[in-house]
From Swiss-Prot:
EC numbers for this chain: 3.5.1.n3
Record-stated family: Belongs to the polysaccharide deacetylase family. ArnD deformylase subfamily.
Taxonomy, superkingdom: Bacteria
Record's keyword annotation contains Transcription regulation: no
Recorded GO MF terms: hydrolase activity, acting on carbon-nitrogen (but not peptide) bonds, in linear amides
GO terms for cellular component: membrane
Keywords: Antibiotic resistance, Hydrolase, Lipid A biosynthesis, Lipid biosynthesis, Lipid metabolism, Lipopolysaccharide biosynthesis
Source organism (scientific name): Shewanella sediminis (strain HAW-EB3)
Function: Catalyzes the deformylation of 4-deoxy-4-formamido-L-arabinose-phosphoundecaprenol to 4-amino-4-deoxy-L-arabinose-phosphoundecaprenol. The modified arabinose is attached to lipid A and is required for resistance to polymyxin and cationic antimicrobial peptides.
Name of the protein: Probable 4-deoxy-4-formamido-L-arabinose-phosphoundecaprenol deformylase ArnD
InterPro entries registered for this protein in UniProt: ArnD (IPR023557), Glyco_hydro/deAcase_b/a-brl (IPR011330), NODB_dom (IPR002509), Polysacc_deacetylase_ArnD (IPR050248)
Pathway: Glycolipid biosynthesis; 4-amino-4-deoxy-alpha-L-arabinose undecaprenyl phosphate biosynthesis; 4-amino-4-deoxy-alpha-L-arabinose undecaprenyl phosphate from UDP-4-deoxy-4-formamido-beta-L-arabinose and undecaprenyl phosphate: step 2/2; Bacterial outer membrane biogenesis; lipopolysaccharide biosynthesis
Pfam family of the protein (one): Polysacc_deac_1
Reaction catalyzed: 4-deoxy-4-formamido-alpha-L-arabinopyranosyl di-trans,octa-cis-undecaprenyl phosphate + H2O = 4-amino-4-deoxy-alpha-L-arabinopyranosyl di-trans,octa-cis-undecaprenyl phosphate + formate
């Protein structure tokens, strides 16, 4: 690929579950090796209790999303019941070898969560001590597996609070990716920069506005901004399993459109840049149930447009 006019897209892989780690990550590693791509993996390493989300089906917005994305066939029934009748497996202990494979392949390794379900459901009510414990348990296990400090993190479910930011700062992350947005920013003076996710995920697009597998990739490519920040999140449970072929086709089409997927650290460019200050707002968006964290300036622009 010619480096002239290449648009870089930070590629973030969220690994939420035991199934995604066991099946999705190895498949993605194969795809990345075939296409000479380096990316950023964010691992959940604690108990897989994601089946406990089944109670959220009582909420209309969550049920609508599950039906639209055909969740049972997309994620697998084992994910949908994991951790409901008994505690889920500790992913980082059961599947340590797979996490090490991703690290050995040269990909950037970051922390997603200790307990993804707990973080997504309780982060806004946890005490500072509880928040620190959740981050610390994940950090310690993941750094033990890789044998080095963990350079970055991305909260589960894009759910971040001021208290979360304060606790994260204690771990010395080079950057965090905790929200949706449009540009890199500093949430508070002295804090690590935020690299927000700019593009929608598979389950947010498919089934809406006549978007299906036949035109999904074209829609993602259309949304890439050649003049701005681009960060795309995939999930090991989706693009690494059921949608692996669709994702590999996206990689091929991206190359044809002079788009290059890169690890997120490459988007920072220089260590000495003074990133602008901005805030994180927690609001609800169409396509997802509950609140998500967003870059404040982007929301303000949308409101004034």
């Amino acid at each position: 690929m010619s480096q002239q006019n290449v648009t870089k897209v930070g590629l973030r892989i969220d690994v939420d579950t035991y199934r995604g780690t066991r099946l999705g990550v190895p498949k993605l590693l194969e795809i990345f090796q075939r296409h000479d791509i380096s990316a950023s993996f964010f691992f959940t390493v604690g108990p897989d209790n994601m089946g406990r989300h089944i109670w959220r089906l009582l909420r209309p917005a969550f049920l609508k999303k599950m039906l639209r994305s055909k969740a049972a066939s997309l994620y697998g029934w084992d994910i949908l019941i994991r951790g409901t009748l008994w505690p889920g497996p500790i992913i980082g202990k059961k599947l340590a070898h797979i996490i090490k494979q991703a690290d050995d392949a040269g990909h950037e390794i970051g922390l997603h969560a200790w307990d993804h379900h707990k973080w997504q459901m309780k982060t806004d009510v946890m005490t500072p001590a509880e928040l620190h414990s959740e981050i610390d348990k994940g950090y310690q296990l993941l750094s033990t597996l890789t044998g080095k400090p963990i350079p970055c993190s991305a909260v589960a479910g894009w759910r971040c609070t001021d208290a979360t930011l304060e606790q994260k700062q204690r771990f010395g992350f080079r950057y965090n990716s905790d929200c949706r947005g449009e540009s890199i920013f500093i949430p508070q003076l002295g804090m690590a920069p935020q690299i927000p996710v700019t593009l929608p995920t598979y389950d947010e697009l498919v089934g809406k506005d006549n978007i299906d597998h036949s035109n999904y990739n074209a829609e993602i490519i259309k949304l890439v901004n050649p003049d701005g920040l681009n960060v795309y999140t995939i999930h090991a449970e989706v693009e690494g399993i059921v949608c692996a072929q669709l994702f590999e086709e996206l990689i091929i089409q991206a190359k044809e459109n002079n788009i290059e997927f890169v690890p997120m650290i490459e988007l920072l460019d220089h260590e000495d840049i003074d990133w602008p200050l901005d805030e994180i707002l927690n609001i609800e968006i169409d396509g997802r149930e509950g609140w998500l964290s967003h870059q404040a300036s982007m929301i303000n622009k949308q409101k004034s447009a």
